[in-house]
Regions:
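Short hydrophobic helical patches associated with two-component signaling proteins
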Residues: 16-17
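Short alpha-helical
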Residues: 11, 35, 56-57, 82
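Conserved acidic segment of CheY-like receiver
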Residues: 1-9, 48
Length: 102
């Protein structure tokens, strides 16, 4: 299931993407709301992960936008170290669940 990661810190987005891709997930990442909207508008994303530093107003707006563009699951993230362990324990099970229709 194609996943979009939105986070305000590019280095953290890169770490999340590295783990997801290493584990076989199709994932893209951005740091800005407009970039996220453009990608979501293009379709094909089933999951949106929104990082903990994304402001409440942006978060709410993007959740609504994602729902309008076929995203099955929005995950609110609050990344903790070690990042790879967090991604594997928190994000990946939810992505798999969304992919299976759950």
């Amino acid at each position: 299931m194609r996943t979009l990661v939105l986070g305000r810190t590019p280095a953290r987005v890169a770490e999340v993407l590295a783990t997801l891709r290493a584990d076989g997930f199709d994932a893209e990442g951005v740091s800005g709301d407009e970039e996220a909207r453009e990608l979501l508008e293009g379709g094909g994303f089933g999951v949106l992960i929104i990082g903990g530093a994304v402001e409440p107003g942006s978060r709410a707006s993007l959740k609504e936008f994602a729902a309008e563009h076929g995203v099955r699951r929005v995950i609110d993230g609050a990344l903790r170290e070690p990042f790879d362990v967090y991604v594997r324990g928190e994000f990946e099970p939810l992505i798999r669940e969304a992919a299976s229709g759950g």
